[in-house]
Amino acid sequence: MGLYSPESEKSQLNMNYIGKDDSQSIFRRLNQNLKASNNNNDSNKNGLNMSDYSNNSPYGRSYDVRINQNSQNNGNGCFSGSIDSLVDEHIIPSPPLSPKLESKISHNGSPRMASSVLVGSTPKGAVENVLFVKPVWPNGLSRKRYRYATYGFLSQYKIFSNLAQPYSKNIINRYNNLAYNARHKYSKYNDDMTPPPLPSSSSRLPSPLASPNLNRQARYNMRKQALYNNNLGKFESDTEWIPRKRKVYSPQRRTMTTSPHRAKKFSPSASTPHTNIASIEAIHDAPQYIPNVSWKKLPDYSPPLSTLPTDSNKSLKIEWKGSPMDLSTDPLRNELHPAELVLAQTLRLPCDLYLDSKRRLFLEKVYRLKKGLPFRRTDAQKACRIDVNKASRLFQAFEKVGWLQDSNFTKYL
């Protein structure tokens, strides 16, 4: 082992330990190492001496020269008494220098480039097998455009073929719905399936993130153009690019569905006469209500007005939601009893319509009495040409004052 050559700690584990206080042992060890080194130099045919070895020594040339002089004077390769001063100057040899970053020779002898050459500097000559890394994020590239470009690149592989397809379909459907909701404010594709043209002032790639200086129509056209270019050929057929036609719903008449196990419920109408009423033959002259005309063509089987109390006009009062009708200017108001006038105002029936409904109700009562049939609330609803709820209130009011008793109609039998 050389004097100044470092050695790993693992190789020194089996050696004898030398204490720091035993200075004579240190000198003896140094003399042995120098003697072995001189013997090797003498046996070398090249004739190297300590001065040649000192070129690789970490210490100065003057230190090596002094060692050579002492060894030559003694002749036996041992140090003289001046070794103490030498050891005092350099007690412990310093470790070798660490490799520099600029060194171009590695431990295995293969050439390599220094780190300072690859970082922040340009090599002077042509260097092979060197990878230069440059930034790949161009100016103006946003996150959304980068995501679109990445999806478009990955969709070229079969494993990522469905990466951009559902996302693009959703965008197309959303834009179509927005266009329909705006009442076709935006332009659609033509019959030849050509997308809307781009603005002439736009020189960059079409993107959903358009310039805020463009108007709303131009930004919409740019988004449609970008979707058309990026997704052309990814769909199964070209028909998916056709905007869906909006269905125009026309108001249809509701029809009643009848179950075979359920009897059909008949709903009376105020305008259509019923054919299953008993007085169908008596109303052939006035089957429908005609203002100020139909009530005069119907026979009057009503009880006399004298049967109503004269001191009160609330004998026919019923409950009805809604504000009453003002009949103070009606020309037929004198044909009604004051209690009947209050009833007509409450049910919001003009005087001629009230007289028409009154005569139809009692006409049905007489004809059913002739046939021996009872007169019920539903019979009154079928006979009158008014709302069924108002006809029920008329039946309730007339029954309260006793006008529906059979004794009032025995003279017509």
From Swiss-Prot:
PROSITE patterns: SWIRM (PS50934)
GO cellular component, one term: Rpd3L-Expanded complex
Superkingdom assignment: Eukaryota
Keyword tags: Phosphoprotein
Residues annotated with Phosphoserine modification: S207, S211
Gene3D superfamilies: Winged helix-like DNA-binding domain superfamily/Winged helix DNA-binding domain (1.10.10.10)
Feature: compositional bias, Low complexity: 35-51, 200-211
InterPro entries on file: Homeodomain-like_sf (IPR009057), SWIRM (IPR007526), WH-like_DNA-bd_sf (IPR036388)
Pfam families recorded: SWIRM
Disordered: annotated span: 35-55, 189-211, 249-271
GO molecular function terms listed in the Swiss-Prot or TrEMBL record: chromatin binding; transcription coactivator activity
PTM annotation (Phosphothreonine): residues: T194
GO terms of biological process kind: chromatin remodeling; regulation of transcription by RNA polymerase II
All copies of domain SWIRM, residue ranges: 316-413
Additional note from the record: FUN19 is a non-essential gene.
Listed name of the protein: SWIRM domain-containing protein FUN19
Organism name: Saccharomyces cerevisiae (strain ATCC 204508 / S288c)
